[in-house]
Amino acid sequence: MNRIIRGVIQYNQKIKAGLVKQFEHVSDHPNPTAVMFTCMDSRMLPTRFTQSAVGDMFVVRNAGNMIPAAPNYGSYSEVSINTEPAALELAVKRGKIRHVVVCGHSDCKAMNTLYQLHQCPTKFDVSSPMDQWLRRNGFESMKKLNERLHIGPKTMKFESEVAPSQSFEAIIDPMEKWSAEDKLSQINVLQQIMNISTHEFLKDYLEAGNLHLHGAWFNIYDGEVFLFSKDRKRFVVIDEKTVPSLSAELERRCPLPEDKAGDVVIQNLH
């Protein structure tokens, strides 16, 4: 806590005045362009590596950047009472956000734990909120990791029953560069996108092309940021060489000229 208090003092001396001016501007012209679901890991600093300013982006953080799937496909009688679906409704239905980004990372402690629980089921603690959270929301990701480890770096299908337009294919770690846990982390990003697509209140937005779901991944070891390319079916590092093709893909897949879709995502992540 002393570190936090000292940090507030430095904030008061060096940052507060400029930040208050930004708050004043945003209060008159709020224009967030995306909502990002990312991990609570202290090494993950999404506003840093996206260079986002005040008012640019909603950020929702939890263990493992997970978004619970809707409890029943097509059911209007049941509501998933969780922070994440509520945040989606706030951002998309009420805030008119058109881009949702799920961002995972390497050496994710939540993914490491999920993998360990699968390797040794007896470690599962029924009284642990963490274990229950991971098992409930990471089960499909774990199934897909098993498939990936069995078939190797081949095409895998991610299919949405509620919003078929959101289905896609992916090749996870084609160069066999990452550990099983990091493969799981990348798979989990894509599976959480599928989970988002299960929510009926988003179906019309998705099917009409008014909402776009993106997968990103951060390598904490070298600071590189990756974006999932549906064209290439893999995570692609964002750098000067790949920006033109990634931007072109986003502009084609996210035809929203009023907010320059390709620029929104790439500029936020690059």
UniProtKB/Swiss-Prot annotation:
Superkingdom to which the source organism belongs: Eukaryota
Documented EC number(s): 4.2.1.1
Gene Ontology MF annotations: carbonate dehydratase activity; zinc ion binding
Catalytic activity: hydrogencarbonate + H(+) = CO2 + H2O
Keyword terms, alphabetized: Lyase, Metal-binding, Zinc
UniProt cofactor note: Binds 1 zinc ion per subunit.
Entry keyword annotation includes Ubl conjugation: no
Family annotation (InterPro entries): Carbonic_anhydrase, Carbonic_anhydrase_sf
Cofactor(s) the protein needs: Zn(2+)
Binding site for Zn(2+): C39, D41, H105, C108
Keyword set includes Lyase: yes
Purpose: Reversible hydration of carbon dioxide.
UniProt record similarity statement: Belongs to the beta-class carbonic anhydrase family.
This protein's name: Beta carbonic anhydrase 1
Organism annotation: Caenorhabditis briggsae
Recorded name of the encoding gene: bca-1
